[in-house]
Amino acid sequence: DMSCHVSEEERNKWNTNVYCNIYYGNNESVREIATACPFDPSAVIIFPTGVTPHVWDAPNSKDYIYTAYGSTFGTTNGLRFRDDRKTLKVYQNLKGIMNEVVCLNESGVAYCYVCIR
């Protein structure tokens, strides 16, 4: 039988499976968000606080998207994992394949991101 002793700090890191934080949009077309996540996330969810996840602008036939999902297997339009997976690259006013416009850095909007181990 082999015992392994770990510190309380190590145990807490192992038990941490979710990391949440917030960033505020500044309307830059491309922005990198350093998450300070204590682990390498395998998935991330970004959503706006106090804003509808997507807004349909009927007169202009545009769908404004304020949410994104990403994993080590791929991401939705407007979100990229940097090589370290702790830095998120988000886009503002990025055109999609139809009439959607990705808005992950809208000025004044608070975005919550959830990193999952």
Residue ranges and their predicted role:
Residues 1-19:
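Fibrous stalk/shaft segments of extracellular and virion attachment machinery
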Residues 2, 91-98:
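Secondary-structure transition/turn motif
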Residues 19-39, 49-58:
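Surface-exposed ligand/attachment interfaces on beta-rich extracellular proteins
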Residues 41-43:
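Aromatic sugar-binding interfaces of carbohydrate-active proteins
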Residues 45-53, 116-117:
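Short, flexible beta-strand-to-coil junctions
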Residues 51-72:
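Short, surface-exposed beta-strand/strand-loop-strand elements in extracellular ectodomains
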Residues 71-92:
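Short, exposed beta-strand/loop patches in secreted or surface proteins that constitute
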Residues 99-117:
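Short, structured beta-strand segments at or near domain termini in extracellular proteins/domains
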